[in-house]
Amino acid sequence: TAMVDCSDYPKPACTLEYMPFCGSDSKTYSNKCNFCNAVVDSNGTLTLSHFGKC
């Protein structure tokens, strides 16, 4: 399983940088910030499926 360090999150705003992450919920997150904010919101239930689009 790929690991992402989300210890610096959540952040109030994310950049528009596009570097997609595929979450365990089968959703594509546009970048690490958006993905990590979602991980924090999910209380750790969301994980990274793989890098790139789902």
Swiss-Prot record:
<keyword id="KW-0677">Repeat</keyword>
<keyword id="KW-0325">Glycoprotein</keyword>
<dbReference type="InterPro" id="IPR001239">
    <property type="entry name" value="Prot_inh_Kazal-m"/>
</dbReference>
<dbReference type="InterPro" id="IPR002350">
    <property type="entry name" value="Kazal_dom"/>
</dbReference>
<feature type="disulfide bond">
    <location>
        <begin position="14"/>
        <end position="33"/>
    </location>
</feature>
<dbReference type="Pfam" id="PF00050">
    <property type="entry name" value="Kazal_1"/>
</dbReference>
<dbReference type="InterPro" id="IPR036058">
    <property type="entry name" value="Kazal_dom_sf"/>
</dbReference>
<keyword id="KW-0722">Serine protease inhibitor</keyword>
<dbReference type="GO" id="GO:0004867">
    <property type="term" value="F:serine-type endopeptidase inhibitor activity"/>
</dbReference>
<feature type="glycosylation site" description="N-linked (GlcNAc...) asparagine">
    <location>
        <position position="43"/>
    </location>
</feature>
<feature type="disulfide bond">
    <location>
        <begin position="22"/>
        <end position="54"/>
    </location>
</feature>
<dbReference type="InterPro" id="IPR051597">
    <property type="entry name" value="Bifunctional_prot_inhibitor"/>
</dbReference>
<feature type="site" description="Reactive bond 3">
    <location>
        <begin position="16"/>
        <end position="17"/>
    </location>
</feature>
<keyword id="KW-0646">Protease inhibitor</keyword>
<keyword id="KW-1015">Disulfide bond</keyword>
<feature type="domain" description="Kazal-like">
    <location>
        <begin position="4"/>
        <end position="54"/>
    </location>
</feature>
<feature type="disulfide bond">
    <location>
        <begin position="6"/>
        <end position="36"/>
    </location>
</feature>
<keyword id="KW-0964">Secreted</keyword>
<protein>
    <recommendedName>
        <fullName>Ovomucoid</fullName>
    </recommendedName>
</protein>
<dbReference type="GO" id="GO:0005576">
    <property type="term" value="C:extracellular region"/>
</dbReference>
